[in-house]
C-alpha cells in the first residue's frame, strides 16, 4: 500500500493559477483565465477577441474552446477548434501549438486519450523548435496525463529539465508541479534516495510562489519520502509541525493524521497511533475521491482507529 496523496488533484488548481498569477503575464492571454469559473473566463476572452487580430485572435479562440472543454461541452469545444484549424496554414507557431494543446485536452477530458497523445507530442515539437518554452513545458506536462508509466515519467523529466533552465515565466511557473510529479515518479519506482532531493526542490519552488497550502503539501511529500527511507523521527517532526500549521489555519488534514499514525506505529507506539488512525479515517472519509478510489485504505484506517 503506497499511502500517498492524489497528486493529480493536489496541484492542478494551483498549477493553473500560478500561470495566471505570474507578473510576466500582464498582457498575456493566460492572465485572462479564471479556471474555477470557465463561463467568466469565456466572457473575458470574448471581450478580448474584439481587441486582437491575426495570430493573437486565433490564440484567444483556442482558449474560448477550452472553456467549453472544462464545462464538458466537448462538442462545442471541437466546433470552435474546427473553425480555427483551416486558418493555421498561414499562422505562426504559437496559435498552432495552442490549437494542438486544446484539441488534445478536449480529447483527453472526453476520455479519448489515444487521440490526445500525438497532439501533445506535436505541440512539444513545434513549441520547442520555435523557442516557445512555456508552451513546450505545458505540452510535456500533458503527455503523462494520457500515457502514464515509463513513457509518462520520461515526459515529466523532459518538462522538468526544460523548466529548470528556462527564463520563460510560463515555463518557470510550471516547475513546482512538474517537480512534484517527477519526485513521485522516482518514489513509485522505489528510488527513494533520488526522489528526496527532488521533493525538497519542489518544496522550495512552491514556497517561492507564496502558495502556503501547496507548500505544506510539498513538505508532507518530503516527510512521506523520509518514511520510505526509514528516517521516521525526521518524518514525524515534519508531520507534527504540519499538524500544528493546519490547525492554526483552522483546517485539518487527514493525510497528515494518516502519516503521523503510520510513523507512530512504525516506531512501536500503537497506542499513540490509534487516535490518529481514527482522525485520519474521519477526515478522509469526508473526501468523495478518497472513498471511491481508496476503499481498502479507508477500511484499514477505520480498523486501526478502533
Model-derived features: positions:
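Bacterial N-terminal signal peptides
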Residues: 12-22
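Amphipathic alpha-helical segments of tetratricopeptide repeats
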Residues: 49-50, 82-89, 122-128, 132, ...
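Terminal, low-structured helical/coil segments at or just beyond the last alpha-helical repeat
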Residues: 279-306
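Tandem amphipathic alpha-helical repeat scaffolds
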Residues: 27-34, 61-73, 97-111, 135-150, ...
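N-terminal leader/linker segments that initiate helical-solenoid repeat arrays
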Residues: 24-63
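Bacterial N-terminal signal peptides that target proteins for export
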Residues: 1-13
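Residue signature of alpha-solenoid helical repeat architecture, marking inter-repeat boundaries
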Residues: 55, 94, 134, 170-173, ...
Amino acid at each position: 500500500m503506497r499511502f500517498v496523496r492524489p497528486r493529480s488533484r493536489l496541484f492542478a488548481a494551483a498549477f493553473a493559477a500560478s500561470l495566471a498569477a505570474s507578473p510576466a503575464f500582464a498582457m498575456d492571454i493566460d492572465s485572462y483565465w479564471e479556471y474555477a469559473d470557465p463561463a467568466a473566463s469565456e466572457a473575458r476572452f470574448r471581450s478580448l477577441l474584439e481587441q486582437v487580430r491575426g495570430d493573437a485572435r486565433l490564440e484567444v479562440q483556442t482558449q474560448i474552446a477550452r472553456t467549453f472543454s472544462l464545462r464538458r461541452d466537448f462538442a462545442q469545444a471541437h466546433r470552435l477548434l474546427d473553425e480555427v484549424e483551416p486558418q493555421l496554414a498561414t499562422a505562426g507557431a504559437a496559435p498552432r501549438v495552442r490549437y494542438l494543446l486544446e484539441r488534445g485536452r478536449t480529447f483527453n477530458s472526453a476520455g479519448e486519450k489515444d487521440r490526445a497523445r500525438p497532439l501533445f507530442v506535436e505541440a512539444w515539437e513545434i513549441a520547442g523548435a520555435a523557442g516557445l518554452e512555456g508552451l513546450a513545458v505545458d505540452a510535456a506536462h500533458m503527455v503523462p496525463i494520457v500515457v502514464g508509466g515509463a513513457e509518462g515519467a520520461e515526459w515529466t523529466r523532459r518538462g522538468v529539465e526544460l523548466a529548470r533552465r528556462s527564463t520563460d515565466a510560463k515555463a518557470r511557473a510550471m516547475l513546482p508541479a512538474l517537480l512534484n510529479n517527477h519526485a513521485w515518479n522516482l518514489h513509485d519506482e522505489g528510488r527513494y534516495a533520488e526522489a528526496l532531493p527532488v521533493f525538497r526542490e519542489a518544496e522550495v519552488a512552491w514556497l517561492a510562489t507564496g502558495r502556503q497550502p501547496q507548500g505544506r503539501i510539498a513538505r508532507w511529500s518530503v516527510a512521506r519520502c523520509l518514511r520510505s527511507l526509514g528516517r521516521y523521527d525526521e518524518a514525524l517532526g515534519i508531520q507534527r509541525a504540519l499538524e500544528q500549521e493546519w490547525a492554526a489555519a483552522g483546517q485539518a488534514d487527514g493525510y497528515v493524521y494518516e502519516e503521523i499514525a503510520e510513523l507512530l506505529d512504525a516506531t512501536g507506539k500503537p497506542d499513540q497511533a490509534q487516535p490518529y488512525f481514527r482522525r485520519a479515517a474521519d477526515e478522509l472519509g469526508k473526501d468523495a475521491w478518497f472513498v471511491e478510489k481508496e476503499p481498502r485504505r479507508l477500511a484499514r484506517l477505520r480498523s486501526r482507529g478502533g
